[in-house]
Design a protein with these regions (language model features):
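N-terminal flexible segment immediately upstream of the FAD-binding catalytic core
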Residues: 1-45, 55-83, 111, 134, ...
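General beta-strand structural signal in soluble alpha/beta enzymes
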Residues: 2-6, 28-30, 49-54, 61, ...
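N-terminal glycine-rich flavin-associated loop
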Residues: 14-50, 70-112, 122, 126-173, ...
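Short, hydrophobic beta-strand segments
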Residues: 22, 26, 242-245, 292-302, ...
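Conserved phosphate/anionic-ligand binding catalytic regions in large, soluble enzymes, centered on
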Residues: 58-59, 121-130, 209-231, 393-399, ...
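C-terminal substrate-binding/cap subdomain adjacent to the FAD-binding core in PCMH-type
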Residues: 123, 131-134, 141-340, 450, ...
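Activity-critical C-terminal alpha-helical subdomain
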Residues: 348-354, 445-482
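Helical (often loop-to-helix) elements that flank the catalytic cores of nucleotide-handling enzymes
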Residues: 409-429, 449, 453-461
């Protein structure tokens, strides 16, 4: 039965992890799939837009809205061989806990895995530290059950392109639209290994297959409401070990390139000043040997022999000359990950009056070989404005989480943020990158989507129109309303 939460919930769900706050008209809780159908019916009849919401961990404000906020309850998980089906409200950590007995996992690991829902991960095309080796959510979705605004419940699976082109309804329309524009879609594909900006239209048609689930992964609740997801799983690696070393900006590309050659699962980056400026230097003291600006965390996983071979390769490479800290005990590796994942929490303690680290350009991603250039470009944008900032991210994929310190309540500071976003996004696009590697567009970046997809934005807007002609789902998120 569809439930309406009390008025006290309106304030709670007016915010997520972003900086935009919007008080909704109502908060609905769907316990079953038919409740989602009923919620969409209420949206149609009332004329109020609807925002599907998971755990509210989204950063560019995908899960707030002025109309109906739709929550889903239920934690059903069904493991079957190499796949697992679950409801969207399942927390990522609980999903992997359920898979543990089978010796498998779904390896996409956002730092918010203890809180984020798998439905949110699908809607956002979430990634994480180990995306370097394992890929993003889009690489693991096998099928989706969705409720569409005009067509009701649908099971989305990959199908033959030939069959999709002859279909009626939304499937045929979208298949023909993408097939007729494959050249321009491919031409505007960012030269990056991870991307959560725009609809992933370049992943839908491949090898004679029309892979419709991939269109909905990363669509941020703008095309339909996911009610069940089926994921591919992989065996849990037998061992994990880590190398931690320091790097200057000048050395960074060379060091990360050398680590990539050894075959890591993750290559992570933290600016030590985040800890030093908040009086938390002790947390990183065991890794400090040379005094350089950055810490690089590199994890290797696999069989015992594979990991041993990787560590031997590190010792034979130029990395050995940089006095790395080698962590071979499981508890030491876990502690190092805790330090890496504490970065944003520690950064939250950085306050200069009303100024705090804010998102906006916190998810830029460049071609892998341009990590140093990306840092230099964004740093220049900050320093010319005299702004303090924090810096960390996924070095292996050249995906940086850099946040300037600004006051979200100051209209002057928010003007600075808009200027920063336009300049930084323009620079990263010239590098062949994307304005979002894993956090998505949301309301915060929607206005800039035309900058990234100058030739294909109209295709994305047409897809939105096909599935949601009344613009009931998350208007203003990703694709701006007409």
């Amino acid at each position: 039965m569809l439930k309406r939460l009390g008025r006290e919930s309106l304030e709670e769900y007016s915010r997520d992890a972003g900086i935009i706050s919007i008080r909704p008209a109502a908060v609905l809780l769907a316990e079953q799939e038919e409740d989602v159908v009923a919620a969409l019916q209420e949206a149609r009849e009332s004329g109020l837009p609807m925002t599907p919401r998971g755990s509210g961990t989204s950063i560019p404000s995908q899960s707030v809205g002025r109309g109906l906020i739709l929550l889903q309850s239920g934690g059903g998980i069904e493991v079957s061989g190499s796949t697992v089906k679950c409801r969207p409200a399942v927390i990522k950590a609980d999903l992997n806990a359920s898979l543990k007995l089978s010796g498998r996992w779904m390896p996409v690991d956002p730092s918010s895995y203890r809180a984020c829902s798998v439905g949110g991960m699908v809607s956002n095309n979430s990634s994480g530290a180990r995306t370097y080796k394992y890929g993003s959510t889009i690489d693991y979705v096998e099928s989706l059950r969705v409720v569409l605004p005009e067509e009701g419940v649908k099971l989305l699976r990959p199908m033959r392109l030939e069959d999709a082109l002859s279909e009626g309804g939304s499937t045929g329309k979208v298949a023909r639209l993408l097939f007729e524009n494959m050249d321009v879609v491919e031409r505007e594909r960012p030269s990056v290994t991870k991307n959560s900006s725009g609809y992933r239209i370049e992943r839908v048609i491949h090898d004679g297959i029309f892979d419709l689930p991939k269109l909905f992964v990363g669509s941020e609740g703008t095309l339909g409401v996911v009610t069940e997801a089926e994921f591919r799983t992989v065996p849990v690696p037998g061992e994990r070990k880590m190398v931690v070393l320091e790097s200057s900006l000048q050395e960074l590309d060379r060091i990360v390139s050398a680590l990539r050659k050894v075959g890591p699962a993750a290559v992570e980056l933290v600016d030590k000043s985040v800890f030093e400026s908040t009086g938390r230097s002790r947390r990183i003291s065991r890794f400090v040997r040379r005094g350089d600006q950055y810490l690089v965390f590199c994890e290797f996983d696999g069989t015992g022999q594979e990991v041993a071979n990787a560590l031997e390769a590190v010792q034979r490479s130029e990395i050995a000359q940089l006095d790395p800290v080698v962590l071979e005990e499981e508890r030491d590796v876990a502690e190092a990950w805790d330090v890496r994942n504490e970065t944003l929490v520690v950064a939250g303690e950085m306050k200069r009056g009303g100024r705090v680290p804010v998102p906006g350009v916190e998810d830029l991603v460049a071609p892998r070989e341009k990590l140093g250039e990306l840092i230099e470009n964004v740093t220049d944008c900050f320093e010319r404005r005299g702004l303090e900032f924090i810096s960390y991210g996924h070095a292996g994929d050249s995906n940086l989480h850099m946040r300037p310190l600004l006051d979200p309540s100051s209209s002057a500071d928010m003007r600075i943020l808009r200027e920063l976003m336009e300049e930084c996004i323009e620079r990263v696009l010239k590098m062949g990158g994307s304005m979002s590697g894993e956090h998505g567009d949301g309301m915060l970046r929607a206005r800039f989507l035309k900058m990234q997809y100058r030739e294909t934005y109209w295709i994305m807007k047409e897809i939105k129109q096909v599935y949601d002609p009344k613009w009931l789902l998350n208007p203003g998120v990703k694709i701006q309303p007409p």
